[in-house]
Amino acid sequence: MDNLDSAQTVPPIAMLAMLLLLLAAVVYYSLLNGVVLHYIKSYINNQGVANPEEVTEGVRNDFWKLTGTSLAIGILTAAGTMLCVIPGIYVGVVLSTIYAVVVFERKEVIDAIKHCFTLIKNEWWMTFATLIVIFILYYFIIMIVQIPQYIYFFIKGFSMMQIISTDPAALFDWGYILLTSIALIFQYLLHTIVVLCVAFIYFHLHEKKYFTGTMEEIDSIGSL
């Protein structure tokens, strides 16, 4: 009974570490979406030339709003998933464009959530299918990048089997740490492409709903 109680007790330092990791992830994804989307916004507003100062100012002004957006996505998606997996998936797809709504339409978090449901109406399945393709490609590329890490892991494991049997930590040397770090950095950078793809999903949905001509404007800038 004592062993069970001790296993279920999480040390305070571990809880603090998990909380800090969660906050770091929220800040990271908020800043990533903010930088990429404000870059696109500046690119469109300045006819194909992004202004770094404009991007920095936009991210600074929207930081707390974007952070609140990240928290709202996490809470609503988690709540939907706990009720049943399908509601979680549905809400996740609906809110996939919320960062773009916050940045491009200057809406507050609550208004942005409402607008996402309006924006995706009658387009949920198409958006879902597009996101599936994007994330399949994303994870496929990540797997390719991680191949050197796995090869190194298995070669070292077989060549140092006797040493590792007495000291498992010997498997995780500087070579493994370096390859893992490179793969993680590439993974974070690659997520930029996911943000870009979701931004174009937003423009497509907005164009179909309101006929604003934004997609034609972007195409015309790209052809200059």
Each model region followed by its residue ranges:
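Transmembrane-helix bundle segments that line or gate the permeation/cavity pathway
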Residues: 1-2, 31
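Juxtamembrane transition segments at transmembrane-helix termini in multipass membrane proteins
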Residues: 4, 37-45, 91-109, 119, ...
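Membrane-embedded or membrane-proximal helical elements that form or frame transporter/channel pores
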Residues: 4-28, 175-178
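Alpha-helical transmembrane segments of integral membrane proteins
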Residues: 20-28, 84, 182-190
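Hydrophobic, lipid-facing residues on alpha-helical transmembrane segments of integral membrane proteins
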Residues: 23, 27, 63-79, 128-140, ...
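Hydrophobic, aromatic-rich membrane-embedded alpha-helical segments
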Residues: 26, 30, 75-97
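Hydrophobic transmembrane alpha-helix segments characteristic of membrane transport
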Residues: 33-59
